[in-house]
Regions:
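Alpha-helix capping/termination and helix-coil
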Residues: 9, 13, 29-32, 80, ...
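Generic recognition of flexible, low-complexity loop/linker segments
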Residues: 3-5, 54-55, 63-65, 90-93, ...
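Residues that flank catalytic or metal-binding motifs in active/ligand-binding sites
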Residues: 20, 72, 132
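Short alpha-beta junction capping motif
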Residues: 1-25, 140, 146, 166
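Proline- and acidic/polar-enriched loop/turn elements at helix boundaries
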Residues: 20-21, 37-38, 148, 178
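An acidic, glycine-rich "communication" segment
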Residues: 23-115
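Extracellular ligand-binding/catalytic regions of CAZymes and related secreted enzymes
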Residues: 81, 85, 101, 107-178
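Active-site-proximal structural scaffolding
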Residues: 1-2, 9, 17-18, 61, ...
């Protein structure tokens, strides 16, 4: 199935992925991008089973508002006038900034935390190294990769224009190489 999708995109088509779909595209090697990896702790400490739910839950992002820095010259940013854009993040999908200098459309701002709970580990280790929106090239086509859901419940209007631009302008976006 991956080869069929890769072949279809490579013929000049556009695929749009959102959140866990973006994670799937990276993990299945559909696109040549990567997720931000956790820093490995070389010391092993056994943890009590009874604490698992609390420890794992602490790292989840249930709903936070983060600030992203938008490249206003990119076609996906058509119609935006301010490079600072609030994005709603309710997942732990952290996508590395692209290898191409021109394809990280929205990266999280230096002072990214606007509102909502986000753990210290996510603040320090993940978000600063991540992009909210990238474009990845496959042959003559492209995959538009959203780390966050730009259409969250139909209530988050600040980023849905990015999604509409992906739909209507996607086939006209080229991915310059360095």
């Amino acid at each position: 199935q991956i080869d069929k999708i890769k072949n279809w995109v490579g013929k000049g088509n556009t695929l749009i992925t959102i959140a866990r779909g973006s994670s799937w595209a990276i993990n299945s090697e559909l696109i040549n991008e990567s997720l931000v990896e956790s820093k490995k702790d070389s010391t092993y400490t056994r943890k009590r089973y009874v604490d698992a739910r609390e420890h794992i839950g602490r790292e989840r992002i249930g709903g936070s508002i983060l600030s992203a820095d938008l490249d206003l010259t990119h076609p996906l940013a058509f119609g935006y006038n301010d490079k600072s854009i609030p994005v709603y993040k309710n997942n732990n999908v952290f996508i590395n900034k692209t290898k191409s200098d021109y394809s990280s459309v929205a990266i999280y701002s230096k002072d990214f935390h606007i509102d909502g709970y986000i753990s210290d580990a996510n603040k320090k280790d993940y978000v600063p190294r991540s992009a909210s929106l990238i474009v990845s090239k496959i042959g003559s086509g492209r995959v538009i990769v959203f780390a966050d859901n730009p259409n969250f419940r139909g209530t988050w209007y600040g980023t849905n224009k990015l999604f509409l631009n992906a739909i209507f302008l996607g086939n006209n976006i080229s991915v310059p190489t360095n």
